[in-house]
Structure formats: C-alpha cells, structure tokens
C-alpha cells in the first residue's frame, strides 16, 4: 500500500512543512530504507551527529521521528512517505527501533480494545448530578444575559452595532465562556468580522451578514429555552451548538454505522491555540455524510486519520443531534478508494431543497455540506441572468456552479482559479459547504479523478488525491 503524492502533501500541518517535506523527498538523503507491509522506515542526516530515525505506517497514516520538531507529521515523516510514493520502498527486515515502534502501536491498539470491553467504572451519581445542575444554572444565567444583550442591541439598531469596537463583542463572548456556553461565545466573537467584511461574491452584504448572525443567535437562544419540547436528538443538537461536550458514556451507547466511507477532503483551521481538523466522509452504500473533528496543540499533535482520496472501511458512530453530522471513527482501516465518485451527488435544485429541509430542522446552522452532480463552473455574466443582481448580495457573484435546474454562487476563495482550471468547463461533481449565499468547494470529481482542496487554505493549488 502507498499513498499518492497529493494525499501525503495534504497531511502537512502547514505550508512550510509541506515545502520542507518535499525537500526531504530525495532517496539519496536517506539510508537504511525498508518496508514491512504498510510500515516504512529510514534514517536521514540531521543537525546532530546521529541521524534522525523516521518510521511511518501508511495505513494510519501515522509517523514517528526522533527529530525535535513538534509538528505532526514532521518534514522527515512527509519526506519518507513522498520517497515511497515516487518509487515503492523495497521490503526488508525492520531494525530494532522500527520494530519497537510497530510493536508499541500493536500493544496500544490491543490495550484500547481491552479498555473498550471493560465494564465502566462506578460513577458517583450524586456528585455527577450536582455538577450537571451547576452547569445548567451557569448556562441558564448566560442565556439570560445574552437575551438582554441582544434586545438592547436590536433597540439601538444594526447601524449602531456595526460601529462597535471589537472589545464590545469580546466582553459578551467572555461572559458566555464564563457561563460555560463556548458555542455561543464563538458565534459572538465572529460577529464583528461579519460586520467589518468587505462585500464579496457569494456572501451577503456586511449589514445583512450581521443581521443573519444575530438572528441565528436569537433562534438558538429560543430553542435552548425549550429543550423539553424538542425530541431527544433535536435537544442534543441544540446543546452541542451551545457548547456542551458529548461524554464518552454517551458515545459508548451510540450505534455503529458500518460502510465503505469515501474520504473526500480534509480542512484545517486554527482556533485560538488549537488546531482543528475536519475529515469529510460520505458512505458509499448509505450516502450518509459525516464530519470527524479532531483537535491538536503544539504538545499534543492531531491523531492519525485516513487521507483524502482514500476509503475508510469500517464503522463510524454519530454524535447525538438532528440532523446528524458529527461522528467519530470506530474500528476500521484505510485503503485505496474503490472509485473516484461523490456518492449521493444530485442536481442544484435537489441540493437547495435538501439545504432548506436541513435549515428548517436547525435554523441556527451556519453551513451544511452539499453534493452536486454534473455541474459546470464559470463566471455568471449579467446577460445570463437578464441583468438582474442578487437580492441578497447586491451584485452578481463572480463565479457559480450550475446545471439546468439552477446555480449556486461560489464563495470567494484564493483557490478558485485552480478549481476552475481543473474543471476546464466540463461537467463535474462537486462537494462543498453551503451557507445559503455561497458554496465553498472542498472536492471535485472529473475525468475519473478526485481533486481535493488543500487542507491548509493558504495553499492555492488543487490536489489530485485519487
């Protein structure tokens, strides 16, 4: 098993690591290269007297290196995998240090399986109930304060709100964090950026964006007041939006959904001092969409995940919520993609209807994944729309994805030129996130190949991953 060059480059934690990894992808720099199954290893000269020892499991993918880098994978791990992608490393007997790493991975996997089968430790239900009630009280107080703040803001009007400094919004967000409602705090912190943004294609005008953001906050607040009137899954979705974590006990009781999951794309974002990675998947048999989110820090790297363009053969467990989307990996393995398709892709009209149905169930959602079949990408000229402007944006979107049933504006993105070049005017299948105004593409299928947007938004070139 080998990963493609594009799949490996998409694993890079940032643009500098990607470039540095390519610099290490020269076989002459490596010594003691070898392979055992999906595991490869080698040694490369570093800054010290002893070479760095690097080992990687392509099935993870996962890697380990003796260099001092805190990035994962480091440039040496990327370089080793790139060497194998260019020309498969020959089989060999693993040295002691590589064998020890392989054995350690097997031991940890076995231990995790054993822990999963162990009966849960007894819980102090009284203490747990006390902690739960204390949080409910703090969140309730935070909701009261947010309600008053929103009413005051609306009395003064959106024009006054647009003139408020960042500190005005940050103070409210800080009080929501203190009230243990981090989901609401994140939304409040995003509001000044909406108000100050310049008009751009595939997005509402700044004042409309601010009004929409405040409206979603108000709807979420109202839903949070009526949890008892909602179904258990709907209530769980509201609580997740407020920032309540899903406990291990809750996830242990969730059913597994087995399928061959096509990994369409990765997306990496920086949130405060955390690195958040989303892995977007769709079931080849079920057509179910899934988003697996992992967090990492400088001292705690992101866990391994299947690369974009691979298939994950196994099970996911979906977190409670309506509609379901967030999931976690259960048992399974990554492997080559069966074929480059976007399961469940449909027309633009069908995608609009699906988005509307989803929004009706959870109107505070900010965006939702959509799949389009055989759409063309291009500039939407005034002549094509009878000279009309978009009533929401006030101007025509620069580019759109469309078919005979309609079109969706493409959100502004520095990677769009690469996307348009790959599409080359041909009908393509497209996967992306839609917010009601613009579609933000993440993956494209054309000519029997899957192309993914780079995980890092700063990387401008689309990657052929399958």
Per-range role (PLM):
Residues 1-466:
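Long, low-complexity, compositionally biased intrinsically disordered regions
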